[in-house]
UniProtKB/Swiss-Prot annotation:
Part of a complex composed of FtsB, FtsL and FtsQ. It holds the Pfam family FtsQ_DivIB_C. Residues 1-29 are cytoplasmic. Essential cell division protein. May link together the upstream cell division proteins, which are predominantly cytoplasmic, with the downstream cell division proteins, which are predominantly periplasmic. May control correct divisome assembly. One of its GO terms (biological process) is cell septum assembly. Keywords: Cell cycle, Cell division, Cell inner membrane, Cell membrane, Membrane, Transmembrane, Transmembrane helix. The chain crosses the membrane at residues 30-50. This is Cell division protein FtsQ. It is found in: Cell inner membrane. The gene is ftsQ. Residues 57-127 form the POTRA domain.
Length: 258
């Protein structure tokens, strides 16, 4: 095998070029680390400055729509004061506010929302009381008892009294008799019902009616006909009308009581 020939005298070896990493690859490699660094920096700045930024949007007001009495307005605002104190627009606990509001006995339904930049707004549907039951609770128009005597004016509500377990039946009597009496512009101011469901009604003209549950609708209609034809002109002189008779009624005049 022939030996390598020596390089000619005076000839120089060409330097070997180092092949570098292309710029595109260097940039591609560096970008993820740059992004990681940027995200870390943003996160650090958020931790440092975000609380201070959010403190610039504190909750200053609680708006309540749908509440028709200042007593109930004040009660709901007082109940929510601790939940919104020191809270900001973004951190205010809407679910807790909803639960606290819905827990008030006179609230039928409520919705809660934020209103930029510093307000929580509640839209409330109130329970509408139609009667006072046994001087201890109110009864809503859907027949549900609820405790809120101090939150309503009771003078304009009829006062119904009867066996605790007979509320539904008593309310049925009240609505049915009230509808019949309304035909002659009479209304029930109070009603006492005993265990046998005999009712004593005091009307808005101070007249007292006594009626038992047997055929009470027929008996009330008979009274309405008599009232429209005879008793209306002297109704203030009538103290009591007893309707517990199959075919008639007993009228007691005020002069008879004195």
């Amino acid at each position: 095998m022939a030996k390598n020939a020596p390089a000619p005298r005076g000839a120089r070896r060409k330097p070997v070029k180092k092949v570098g990493v292309p710029l595109r690859e260097r940039v591609a490699t560096a970008v993820p680390w740059m992004l990681v660094g940027s995200v870390a920096m943003v996160s650090l700045l958020a931790v440092i400055y975000l609380p201070a930024a959010l403190d610039g949007y504190p909750i200053r007001k609680v708006g309540v729509d749908g509440v028709t009495d200042v007593r109930r307005q004040q009660q709901i605002e007082t109940a929510l004061a601790a939940l919104v104190r020191e809270e900001n627009y973004f951190s205010v606990p809407l679910e807790e506010i909803y639960q606290q509001s819905q827990g008030l006995s006179w609230v039928e339904e409520v919705s809660v929302r934020r209103q930029w930049p510093d307000t929580v707004v509640l839209t409330v549907e109130e329970r509408r009381p139609v009667a006072v039951w046994n001087e201890s609770v109110l009864v809503s128009d859907s027949g549900q008892p609820f405790k809120a005597l101090k939150q309503y004016d009771l003078d304009d509500l009829p006062h119904l009294n009867g066996p605790e377990q007979r509320l539904e039946e008593v309310m049925g009597f009240y609505h049915s008799m009230g509808k019949t009496l309304a035909d002659v512009d009479l209304s029930i101011r109070s009603m006492e019902v005993n265990a046998r469901l005999t009712a004593r009604l005091t009307l808005n003209n101070d007249m007292e009616l006594v009626v038992d549950r047997e055929h009470y609708t027929t008996k009330l209609r008979r009274f309405v006909r008599l009232y429209r034809g005879v008793l209306n002109t002297d109704s203030r002189q009538v103290a009591r009308v007893d309707l517990r008779y199959a075919d008639g009624m007993a009228v007691t005049w005020r002069e008879q009581q004195s």
